[in-house]
Amino acid sequence: MKAVVLGSGVVGLMSAWYLQKSGYQVTVVDRQARSAEETSFANAGQISYGYSSPWAAPGIPQKALRWLMEEHAPLKIKPSLDPQLLKWATQMLANCQLSRYQVNKARMLAIANHSRECLSQLRQEHDIEYQGRQQGTLQIFRTQKQLIAIEKDIALLEQSGTRYQRMSVDECIKQEPGLAAVSHKLTGGLYLPDDETGDCYLFCQQMTELAQQQGVTFLFNTNVKKVNAQGNQVVSVSTDAGELQADVYVVAMGSYSTALLAQLGITIPVYPVKGYSLTVPITDESQAPVSTVMDETYKVALTRFDDRIRVAGTAELAGFDPAIPEKRKATISMVVNDLFPHSGDFAKAEFWTGFRPMTPDGTPLIGKTPLKNLYTNTGHGTLGWTMACGSGHLLSQIITGEQSENQAGLDLFRYAS
């Protein structure tokens, strides 16, 4: 049995990995020269099982209106009459109801916790070096209102069996000593001990080598021109390297999956939500974060690699605009300077932007399509690195017919109504 996976970001890569473990002869196609050269290249670096939450949440519509007027707001919207964006935004607003938020978050936590198990097993079986740490995430709050609001999430964490610890300001400083000088800016925190960190790009390079050793073929520098269908199934994929034929096909092209599937008359609600990051070399380890610190006010994550800090945040609805405006640089620079001002050489900061493939309800699209041998694994938003291993494993189970309690409600048919 043969499988073709379109896309070699962390989600496509792990789709290929688990398909080959299930006995498939796998070919991966990507337009870049290496794996993870796009959205997976310089993401936040956080593997946030406990922080897996939909952006569509109660109170977000009101917050979004306020953020439009704030200089360092976590959400920016570029005015547009794009019908895809308008439909996507309408669906997102509908998912801000508490009842839908609870369903969506529960699904996301289930995928994330399954992914934790898969990544743990992967580390046990293979010697993978990606500057990974297993020291948790500290979500910090600057207002009493934020402390109170977290209670609704704690109930869902308990329901999913996700460990957590409420922390006072003193406990936050004990967990992250680098915050000591700014303790007066904090009101408390929520610690998620099972969360991890790591350089997604390094992980992908390691996994590409392992996959090649297991027989997976990678066609880099190869553009997908068209997916060809006859009747109710795909018969081939046209690329600039020729035609590819397989028994099953997986679309894992992040935000670019939407346009490709549209050629087949398949509509998916995945829209590019632009994010930004900076990477700064550490000059004083005692002043740097130990693991990941998540600033709830600005929705910015600060993650520790071995000798670097990765700072990532901002959600911008601007289509596929690759520009990095100075205002966006200023926001993420402001947060790291505010919390860890003496940690690194900010003159050497490297900025990056990527397009997160976001669904309106936050849950990815994993599973079947109207064409019987075509599958999707996309729409993970900010949680591709967090959910990649679990998503790849779940997809392989769906394709091979193995049943799992975590499969329900993940495919695109949940948007059919």
From Swiss-Prot:
A GO-annotated cellular component: plasma membrane
Which family does the record claim for this protein? Answer: Belongs to the DadA oxidoreductase family.
User: Which one Pfam family would you cite for this protein?
Assistant: DAO
User: Which metal ions or organic cofactors does this protein require, according to UniProt?
Assistant: FAD
Keywords of this entry? FAD, Flavoprotein, Oxidoreductase
GO terms for biological process, alphabetical: D-alanine catabolic process
Which molecular-function annotation in GO is an example for this chain?
D-amino-acid dehydrogenase activity
Q: What is its EC number?
A: 1.4.99.-
**The name this protein goes by in its record:** D-amino acid dehydrogenase
Function as written in the Swiss-Prot or TrEMBL entry:
Oxidative deamination of D-amino acids.
Q: Could you tell me which NCBIfam families the record lists for this protein?
A: PRK00711.1
Its recorded reaction(s) are: a D-alpha-amino acid + A + H2O = a 2-oxocarboxylate + AH2 + NH4(+)
Residues at which FAD binds? 3-17
Keyword Flavoprotein applies = yes
